[in-house]
Amino acid sequence: MNCVCRLVLVVLSLWPDTAVAPGPPPGPPRVSPDPRAELDSTVLLTRSLLADTRQLAAQLRDKFPADGDHNLDSLPTLAMSAGALGALQLPGVLTRLRADLLSYLRHVQWLRRAGGSSLKTLEPELGTLQARLDRLLRRLQLLMSRLALPQPPPDPPAPPLAPPSSAWGGIRAAHAILGGLHLTLDWAVRGLLLLKTRL
């Protein structure tokens, strides 16, 4: 029996084409995703996060009314005025938007940790906001990769944010963070829609 097996192997080795099963036929080359569709998806996520931020800011105002402007020196300044939208270029917009949103993500995480007991009632909404910010950041990273844009250098470690000096300080910080994030996302939607027309 052993000899028969060896004989079969020898015979098969004489005709290698019959011994090796052919592989699957080569398919059509993979089509890279349309960057306009990727940009559409990013705009939808940004609009959704803008609506969430607007709603959470309204809840905060209802629970803790606070007149006037609220600022945090550690927050990024608004990337661009609405009047300067015409001069935008895609690489700069995506890089700046990613950097600003990373800063806001860090501030939302800080607010959840150090905002004080008054803000605990908004914890579920702040958690959802943090998760959606993270999702949008991943989408921006994917979009930059699909467009073959140069990857930004790693961000240097940011200094830790000091805890609010009082419960009221935490509330004012929340107003500043949500207000700034709202303006940034509104600017981002306008800028991304304009840039889509140039792709």
UniProtKB/Swiss-Prot annotation:
Q: Which purpose does this protein serve, as stated in its record?
A: Cytokine that stimulates the proliferation of hematopoietic stem cells and megakaryocyte progenitor cells and induces megakaryocyte maturation resulting in increased platelet production. Also promotes the proliferation of hepatocytes in response to liver damage. Binding to its receptor formed by IL6ST and IL11RA activates a signaling cascade that promotes cell proliferation. Signaling leads to the activation of intracellular protein kinases and the phosphorylation of STAT3.
Q: What is this protein called?
A: Interleukin-11
Instruction: Give the organism, scientific name.
Output: Homo sapiens
Quaternary structure note: Interacts with IL11RA to associate with IL6ST, giving rise to a multimeric signaling complex.
User: Which PANTHER family would you find in this protein's record?
Assistant: INTERLEUKIN 11, INTERLEUKIN-11
| S-S bridge residues | none
Gene Ontology biological process terms, A to Z: B cell differentiation; cell population proliferation; fat cell differentiation; interleukin-11-mediated signaling pathway; megakaryocyte differentiation; negative regulation of hormone secretion; positive regulation of cell population proliferation; positive regulation of MAPK cascade
Q: What is the effect of changing D186V?
A: Increases affinity for IL11RA and stimulation of cell proliferation
SUPFAM superfamilies assigned: 4-helical cytokines
The protein's GO terms of the molecular function aspect are: cytokine activity; growth factor activity; interleukin-11 receptor binding
